[in-house]
Amino acid sequence: MVELTKSLDGLEKLIGLSFKDSHRLELALTHSSLKQGRDAANYERMEFLGDRVLGLAIAERLFVEFPTAPEGELSVRLNLLVSAETCAAIADELGLGRYIRHGGELTKLAAQRTRNIRADVV
């Protein structure tokens, strides 16, 4: 647990945020393949909420930055910015992959699937 705490401290420094509840940060990085008991918590519920928050934040920014753009153009821009490809690229740029907690079988998955997992934690 000490090693995980040090790792999370490093992540907080990397992203420039400090979490009051480090358990939430740990949960946000825990893939369902990490089996820690029958009803082990993972990031899926947080991902659901995070996707909506990210979408809303990006939509609001696009709305302000492109005041004359029609809805269709805003939608295209939004979808590009919140896509799995974009989120995975951000995760890769930040090196978030090394912080994701997962079961060993994850290394056997196809690149497309691991890209989605990296995108999930953004």
Give the role of each language-model region.
Residues 1-122:
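RNase III-family endoribonuclease catalytic core
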